[in-house]
């Protein structure tokens, strides 16, 4: 199969859908891989690295879409890409069709075959392609929250973990799923006083088994959340 890797052009998206090592794996299995010029540069991968892996470099996004039988992306095509997707072409990416009617209609009109990573379910009922994104989101939320606690960002001017003689920040995490679990672990690792709320008592019991001592679990109710929001320094 002819596989195309276009450069991501959505605002603030710096990732690339296939690493040079991934390209090498595909080439060794008999596939042809075309990568747009500088597609991987913002992720630290040069064109030369892809060429050494056996991939071919194409100068433009139009060339990649026009050549490939299967397009592999990170994020959904933006409006300028709609016309590049052609009938029968396979497009693998995170689409999130439910929140974007224009994108959905454009892909239907193109008659392409779309595989939305976020809908892939394994035999255990898990979402193996969505979980890594959720792990990143949970951990990043704490980093961003810590930044907005700084005075220059309009915050209280406190550290998540405090310092000797000063209490740590109180962090509230709503939901004990993948995002919430990773947010709680990240905040706890920085020394914060963390409370994680969820509506599932079985899930709260699971969290109690492996969370560090500075993480408390609490049933998610309107009353509990109202009280915690009033006293928390940060909420994820």
Predicted regions span which residues?
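An N-terminal-biased, well-structured beta-alpha scaffold segment characteristic
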Residues: 2-106, 110
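Generic secondary-structure signature for well-ordered alpha-helical cores
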Residues: 28-32, 55-56, 70-73, 109-113, ...
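Residue-level detector of alpha-helix initiation sites
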Residues: 76, 136, 177-179
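Conserved small/polar residues in nucleotide/adenosyl-binding loops
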Residues: 230-236
């Amino acid at each position: 199969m002819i596989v195309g890797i276009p450069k991501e052009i959505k605002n603030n998206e710096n990732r690339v859908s296939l690493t040079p090592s991934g390209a090498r794996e595909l080439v060794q299995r008999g596939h042809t891989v075309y990568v747009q010029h500088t597609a991987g540069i913002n992720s630290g991968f040069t064109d030369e690295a892809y060429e050494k892996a056996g991939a071919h470099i194409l100068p433009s996004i139009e060339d990649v879409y026009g050549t490939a039988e299967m397009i592999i992306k990170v994020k959904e095509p933006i409006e300028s890409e709609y016309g590049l997707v052609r009938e029968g072409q396979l497009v693998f990416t995170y689409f999130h069709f439910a929140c974007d009617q224009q994108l959905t209609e454009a892909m239907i009109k193109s008659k392409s075959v779309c595989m939305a990573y976020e809908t892939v379910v394994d035999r255990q009922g898990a979402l193996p392609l969505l979980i890594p994104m959720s792990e990143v989101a949970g951990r990043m939320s704490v980093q961003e929250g810590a930044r907005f606690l700084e005075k220059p960002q309009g915050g209280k001017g406190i550290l998540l973990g405090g310092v000797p003689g000063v209490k740590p920040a109180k962090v509230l995490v709503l939901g004990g799923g993948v995002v919430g679990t990773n947010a709680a672990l990240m905040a706890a690792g920085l020394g914060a006083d963390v409370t994680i709320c969820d509506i599932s008592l079985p899930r709260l019991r699971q969290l109690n088994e492996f969370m560090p001592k500075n993480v408390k679990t609490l049933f998610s109710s309107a009353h509990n959340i109202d009280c915690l929001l009033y006293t928390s320094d940060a909420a994820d």
